[in-house]
Structures are given as structure tokens and as C-alpha cells.
Amino acid sequence: MGHIADILKYEGDNTTFVWKHPCEDFNNYTQLIVHETQEAVLFLNGQALDLFGPGRHTLETQNTPLLSGLLNRTTNGETPFHCEVYFINKTEQMAIRWGTDSQAQFLEPTYHFPLSLGASGEMSLRVLDARRLLLRLVGTAPVLDQQTLAAYFRAFLMARVKTYIAQFMQANTVSIFELDAHMLDFSQALQQQLAPDFADYGVELVRFFVTNLARPDGEAQYEKFKELHFRKYADIAEAQLRQQTDLIQAQTEAQKSSD
């Protein structure tokens, strides 16, 4: 058995979600310090046991009932004992980038032409259920940082986002040429759709932003409908301006006649 730890704590940065303490040998005098923004989970033989909130804890078997029960069966309550401690960062971690790896193919809902569209942006995540996250994603890995967590979610995130892009445009009758004006609503709709998928792994999707849309600029069919779309609104604006001008002229002529 190696060195027996006296104090266990984690002072890492804010880009790490989970960190496993390198020391795995403890006794009844070992102190566990959990900061205000953290939780700690004890593992023995691959089983998640007691969870500790913020504060200073002594790892006495009488204070850790799940650990105590296992130790009494396996070591007759003798110390020191061998287990693992994982620290979980509970803060909201922001500016985590995401993006579709390819463009989604669907029928543009307003003008009904085939369209390829990709998206990218940022999201913020927070650990919602430490035990679930450890059991479903972390496993025996010593660290779970932003990059690794984003990589875990990349596959289903790409699939969901591509599907939800088309659904949002169809449900809200928003054309591809108007989507920029609805970016906030679009982002919030995607967040609501994606949140349950993250929660399944013990992670809260706190914020989700679409900041960029990858359109098929330069593609002949896309450019044709783009020109038609903006020409339509230009013609409407021109007609309204002409109507206002004619009204002003009529009012002016009427004023002259009355004079």
C-alpha cells in the first residue's frame, strides 16, 4: 500500500468538470476538503458510494455509511483502506464551442427548394447529477475537461441540431433568408430540444447559442431564390413609397386648390 493521504482537496481551474485525486490510500484521519463550488464522490471497487458537499470532512467509516458497510464486510473494519475520490466542479462553464461537422440537407419551407445548411456557436454546461455523470461518462478516466465532454456529446449534438434546424424553420414559417432575425428564438428552441439529452448524462445545458449559419453562398439555385426574396421586399417597399408620395402630392394639390 502506498502513501496514506492526510488531506484531499482540488484547486484546479474552471475548465475541468471532474478530477480524480491521484492518492487512493486513506485512513480514519484523512481530511477531505470540498470547496463551495464542488462535490466529491467516493468509489470502492468500482462502486459509487458516499457523496460529500462543501465543507471539511473526516473520512471516518462512521461518517461514510456506504463505505463503512463495504469495509466491514471486506476488511473487518481495519484501516487504512483503499478507494478513489472524484472531485466534481459544479460551476457553470461557458464559451464551450460547438458546430455541425457537415451541412444538413432539407427542403426550404418557404420557397421549397433543396437547401444545405450548417450551424455553429457556443454553449454553457453545468454538472447536474455528479453520480450519473461519473457512472455514464467518466468511468475510470482521471479527468473530464471541457474538450473531452464536448467530444462525448458531439455525435448526438450534430444529429439533433441538423434535425431541429428544419423543424424550427417549418414550424415558424421562417425562410433561410430571414433566419438571422430569429437567431435568439432559434437558439432558445434548440436549447429546449437538446436539454433532455444532456440531462440523461447528469449535465445541464444552461445556455445554447447559434452564432453562425453556414449557407450555400454562391450556389446557383440558392442565389436565385435569394435574389427573388430580396427583390420581393424591395418591390413592396418601392410600392409603399410610391403610394406615400402620391398621397403627399394629392394633399399638396388639394391644399393649393383650397388656397
Could you describe each region identified by the protein language model?
Residues 4-133:
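Hydrophobic membrane-anchoring helix/hairpin
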Residues 86-93, 98-259:
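Elongated, amphipathic alpha-helices that form coiled-coils and helical stalk/scaffold elements used
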